A protein has these predicted regions:
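Conserved NTP/Mg2+-binding pocket subregion across the NTase superfamily
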Residues: 1-80
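Acidic catalytic cores of enzymes that act on phosphate-bearing nucleotides/polynucleotides
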Residues: 72, 99-107
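Solenoid-repeat scaffolds in large eukaryotic assemblies
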Residues: 86-88, 232
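Small-residue-rich helix-loop
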Residues: 95, 109, 113-127, 149-159
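Long, low-complexity C-terminal extensions of enzymes
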Residues: 135-181
Length: 235
């Protein structure tokens, strides 16, 4: 399982998570566990289930960029110059990136391509996207279905307060990257504050809250996640 993650341990930093491959992580966290009396295997799987939010957003931004480049830009240009091969490659890239974006927004790891469409059909919020992808694959109203797929992704971006844009997917990608930068910076500040807080010596002894990082981090996130980068960087 750890080999599937690309490490001999569970990634424990944003930098390590950045180099994990979602298809491998999908293999690691799916499937039935028939026996794990020690709980070791289950514990590792649970820790691999959710990646840091800034990494999720950066991976999402990458797929949104691909959607814009392949579906909203390359495909119509290829059709305009009567280049069916280039159009085919653009559509293939668009379908893959839109389905991967749907998985990321659903907090799921996208599986390998042979299972990607079936997995997308099972995502609760992306019925319209799955239908649009099928229609594109069958050559039906391609331009219209590209925009239907984009609209489905944009709707969930708005629901998760990642982007409110109705523009090209590249604009949504920029919004996702900006949000990732805010979260990464906030998490660095929270970690530094906790380190200082942990070392405080009180006259009456160590306070209970000094051993409760979970509550401490939630309180700080509720504050810092609402700030813009310039304000965070001024701390």
């Amino acid at each position: 399982m750890l080999f599937r993650s690309g490490f001999d341990h569970v990634p424990n930093s944003s930098e390590e998570w950045q180099y994990t491959v979602d298809e491998n992580l999908a293999c690691a966290v799916n499937g039935s566990i028939f026996m794990d009396n020690s709980g070791f295997f289950t514990n590792i799987r649970q820790r691999l289930q959710v990646q840091p939010e800034d990494i999720r957003l950066r991976k999402l931004a990458a797929e949104l960029e691909k959607m814009a480049q392949s579906g909203q830009y390359n495909y119509p240009r290829a059709m305009k110059r009567t280049d069916p091969a280039a159009a085919f490659f653009a559509l293939s890239a668009f379908m893959e990136s839109s389905m991967k974006a749907a998985h990321i927004l659903s907090q799921k790891y996208a599986p390998y391509s042979k299972w990607l469409f079936r997995s997308t059909e099972a995502l609760p919020k992306f019925d319209e996207l799955a239908i649009a992808v099928r229609n594109i694959a069958e050559g039906k109203n391609i331009t219209e279905n590209i925009e239907i797929a984009c609209a489905a992704v944009r709707a969930e971006l708005k629901a998760q307060q990642i982007s409110n844009s109705d523009d090209y997917m590249s604009v949504c990608a920029d919004d996702a990257k900006h949000r990732a930068d805010i979260i990464y910076t906030a998490e660095e500040i929270i970690a530094m504050e906790w380190d200082f807080f942990d070392k405080v010596q009180n006259e009456g002894g160590r306070a209970d809250c000094q051993d409760d990082y979970y509550t401490f981090s939630i309180m700080r996130r509720s504050q810092y996640y609402c700030w813009e980068l310039p304000m965070l960087c001024s701390l």
